[in-house]
Design a protein with these regions (language model features):
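Long, charged, low-complexity, helical-prone intrinsically disordered regions
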Residues: 1-188
Length: 188
């Protein structure tokens, strides 16, 4: 914790429960790899960003020279997924972190524009990628005005024009976002 600007430290034995299990290094690395793969669903077989060791199953992606590892549970869940769900990804989402993987699997070149000069921005200061099913379809440029208690949607940038059903799905997700944030949605 902190006390003003000073960090406070504590001994591990006073923070963690006494009956916590202890693992050897190999077992701890294996468990960490499984946890990483479960979180990501898919990872490069040998990746410096998300090392998963031998967790999951080896997978070959058509057209890719790289080998991947997949979480079998995530793979099985795809069978039950009707697809088409819309999600706004936080610009710092782990899915966006490995840019080469993102470009290879989704053909999506992502650039966080908050550090670009305003004149060079294409989508907005903190635009959120819009994932629809298994493809990136646009960017949401929105911000919360806490003083007004409102979600302001500056723009929805469509990579290709949305059909009416896709437009309705994105609008519904924006409404859900405003509700989740506990603010009203300004007309856009």
């Amino acid at each position: 914790g902190r006390e003003c600007r000073h960090r406070l430290w504590e001994l591990a034995e006073r923070v963690y429960p006494k009956d916590r299990p202890e693992y050897c290094l190999d077992e701890a690395e294996r468990m960490l790899g499984e946890r990483r793969l479960h979180s990501a669903g898919i990872a490069k077989h040998r990746s410096p960003w998300t090392p998963v060791g031998e967790a999951g199953e080896l997978a070959v992606i058509e057209g890719s020279p790289r080998k991947y590892r997949v979480d079998p549970e995530a793979l099985a869940a795809l069978e039950d997924d009707p697809g088409g769900r819309v999600a706004f990804l936080n610009p710092y989402d782990g899915m966006l972190f490995d840019r080469p993987r993102l470009a290879e699997l989704f053909e999506f070149e992502y650039v966080l524009e908050q550090f670009k000069p305003k004149a060079q921005r294409k989508y907005g200061f903190f635009a959120h990628p819009i994932l629809m099913g298994d493809r990136f379809v646009g960017m949401l440029d929105a911000e919360v005005d806490r003083a007004e208690g409102a979600l302001n949607v500056n723009a929805v940038h469509e990579f290709l024009p949305f059909d009416p059903e896709e437009d309705e799905m994105v609008r519904a997700e924006v409404e859900d976002l405003a509700e989740w944030l506990g603010v009203t949605l300004r007309a856009w």
